[in-house]
Amino acid sequence: MEKDFTERSTKGQRKLANGVVENIESKLKNHLDNNNVINKSVNYEDVMCSNVKLSVHDDEYDIKNIKKDVCNLSKLSEERLSNNISLKDNNKVVKNPEIDTKTARQQYKKRLNSTQSTMNIEGNINNEKDDIIEDYDDGLIRNMDYEMSIVKNKRNNNNNNNNNNNNNNNNNNNNNNNNNNNNNNNNSNNVDNRKRNKNEECYDESYCISDNLDEITSYRNKLSLYNKLRMCFNYFGPGWIVAIAYLDPGNLCSNLNVGLIRSPDPTLEKDYSGYYLLWIMVYGHMLGFIFQVLSMRLGHVTGLDLASLCSKEFDRTTSTIIYVLVQIAIWGAHIQAIIGTFIALNLIFGISVKVAIFYTLFEAIIYSFLENKSLGLLENVLSFLVGILAVSFFVNVFMTPINFKELAISILYPRIPKGKEIDALALLGSIISAHIFYLHTNLTAKKKSVICNDLSLRRYNTLGTIESGGSLFLSCLTNCIIVLTFAEVNLKSFERRDQYNLFTAYEVMRKSFGKISMYIWSFGLLSSGNNSSFMCEYASKSVVEGFLNKKINTFVRVFTFRLMLFSLLYMFLTLNKYTLDQLTNFINVIQVLLLPMATIPLYRFSIHENVLGEFRLKKFPKFAVFLIIIAIIISNVLLTFLDFVHKETSLITIFFLVIFSFLYFGFIIYFFNIPIKKNYIQRN
């Protein structure tokens, strides 16, 4: 056993290995001591459930091993019943022969749900008061394979005893003693073989660097670059899922519209109007990074998501209003995802749009299966699709002649072309959406179970910041590439920019960069639609469970929402498929107007001592985030007003606009003044 752990360099890791061996050997010695195996009333259910709670393996290991062992409990129950029948004559009865398999499976599901979609760094040791173990060695990781070997050894002993009782009634006691002694010797040999056999070692050291957080902090500078990178990659997950929201079909539609902006002046030798709104793209991702870090910190410190905090703190009416508005934002993003998916299928395979929309129902079945199977598997699928998306659009960089001087000017010098205020607003709405902050807090809150003190909390916050920064940098780069690709398209004088949308964007790519670029665009759009669809389902689940405080069957929830959205889209398709582009832009505007429904409560909880304690925003950061939220709210209303000024609007439209503005600002002012009374901080 010690030989298997020679690759570990720190003292704490050697102690971890030695402690596991000593723990298991002592248990084997106690459980397999001569004739006491049968007389002891060991409850197998307790053994299994305790190990489910204390398992430190990742979700993949749980699925392959623990689930299989828990499902075999019924077989152990039958053997115990048969042992009782055969041992009645000797007054030796195993107590509690019926194993409560239902309870054991519930414990397994509870353990799996509490830590799924998170990678293990410190070891998933339960932090609840009932599970705190005083002794250091007892607090070490329990090895599931060794525990199951105990169960199997007991079962073999019982079977051997039964055979001896049936065949040698006169010498029953002697045979039992001999068999037990032989089995004990075999068991000790098996333990030695397990120590020597590296292939049977179930502890996966790739998911754990050290169990001693103080030691990690003390020797931080001595950790190799490889170990530091491994720590980062073991954490990664939530930030990359959230980054999908920055690369959905709504973003692609806004990027297309912004990149195809052209100046009305026909005398320009080279028109760079498509570059003008890149500053919104870059600064929008910076704002997104700030709020993603706040979301991540809120989940790590409290162990609750933003929806649960709103439900617990605000009254039912306010919570219901927020829930409805956030759910509208999710449905809007989901509609955009479905649009992007069946447009891509139509472009790649030539399938009719009305037939391609049924693919979304099949996609719902896939999502339901992945969520019920393992959220770790779902994360892997989403990461693969994100990779396809990034590669597809990065290839366009080598086909596009970019003017880097104009690019730098457009980022550093904010400007909005005349009459393009609604495009600027839609671009901001496509970048930052309300539901992504609810989703991010939900994902990071699940890591609370493996955060055991303030040192690990700070480390997790650092890793979360690195992950959010890296994922949003990749997202910003990809979106800018899409804008620049369409900004460099040479439109003819007789062609209008309004002629191109998600349906016809492939024609622009084909004319300017060749046929292969058309397929690159289509595959990127398909990957974006699938990614965004899965992400919206995940966000919907977290919002429903957080606000309503109840779990809804995945299959029922997914199909109900999909059928509703399917009916709405089919109605649009029966009218004219090109209205979908206008629908996508309208949804982006709605997204940015609903953004305060996430940023305001996130800000309120992030500055309150009862929620984040010493990790709350203080002084300058607190004031800076407040100004950002106010600037977003004012820009929303101002850009909407300017867009109406450039158009001919009726008195009824102006009347509704004024009423909406009063209601909008009134609710926001009320939202800012709701007191936070409860204490959510969990001190480690």
From Swiss-Prot:
Keyword Transmembrane: yes
Localization: Vacuole membrane
Cytoplasmic topological domain residue ranges: 1-228, 300-319, 371-381, 446-465, 535-554, 604-622, 674-684
Biological process annotations from GO: iron ion transmembrane transport; manganese ion transport
Key words, A-Z: Ion transport, Iron, Iron transport, Membrane, Transmembrane, Transmembrane helix, Transport, Vacuole
Gene Ontology cellular-component terms listed: membrane; plasma membrane; vacuolar membrane
A Pfam family that the UniProt record links to this protein: Nramp
Region (Disordered): 153-195
Vacuolar side: 248-275, 346-350, 405-423, 488-515, 574-584, 646-650
Record membrane topology: Multi-pass membrane protein
Transmembrane segments: 229-247, 276-299, 320-345, 351-370, 382-404, 424-445, 466-487, 516-534, 555-573, 585-603, 623-645, 651-673
Induction, as annotated: Expression is modulated by the levels of iron ions in the environment.
MF term (GO), any: cadmium ion transmembrane transporter activity
Catalytic reaction annotation: Fe(2+)(in) = Fe(2+)(out)
Main location: membrane
Phenotype on disruption: Repeated attempts to generate a knockout failed. Conditional knockdown results in rapid parasite death. Impaired apicoplast biogenesis. Impaired mitochondrial polarization.
Biological function: Iron transporter. Required for parasite development during the blood stages. Required for apicoplast biogenesis. Required for mitochondrial polarization.
Matching NCBIfam families: Nramp_1 (NF037982)
Other remarks in the entry: Exogenous supplementation with non-toxic concentrations of iron or other metals does not rescue parasites with stringent gene knockout. Culture supplementation with Fe(2+), but not other metals, nearly fully rescues parasites with partial gene knockout.
Family listed: Belongs to the NRAMP (TC 2.A.55) family.
Record-given protein name: Divalent metal transporter 1
Organism, as annotated: Plasmodium falciparum (isolate 3D7)
Upper lineage: Eukaryota, Sar, Alveolata, Apicomplexa, Aconoidasida
